[in-house]
Amino acid sequence: DAQAVALGRALRDRRGDAQINRAIREGRPLPKAKVDWMVERYTARYVKYRAEVIGRTEALRAVHQGTEEMYAQAIESGEIRAEQIERKWVTRLDGRERRTHKFLSGQKRGWGEPFATENGTIRYPGDPQAPATEVIQCRCALATRIKLR
């Protein structure tokens, strides 16, 4: 129903909830100015939320791309060999993780070996070549170990 839809939006400004409930209870529409105010508040919160999502996603991508580049340069310079690198997928298991990333948690791969999900392959959290469904708002990490022997 209309009430559930209006009050079910997480980004709404809750200061308008009482007026929505009253208007529904009394069977009358909200004044246009109030609707405009609610839409403005929702839009502002949505824009802020999207900026945060994009910022977190891109920051994660930059961190992991930089780390991958660091290891690539170390291999290229001969400081380490590719077969010495072991990467383990670490998922924050707090109930908000993707099902596909929960499955990846703890899996190990060597250098250059991608992880596989039902949506495709992913080299690391935030991988720009992976499907968006696997990277947007990802909070995973890679634990990389260099085997000395």
Task: Name each model-derived stretch.
Residues D1-T43:
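Structured, charged N-terminal subsegments at the starts of enzyme catalytic cores
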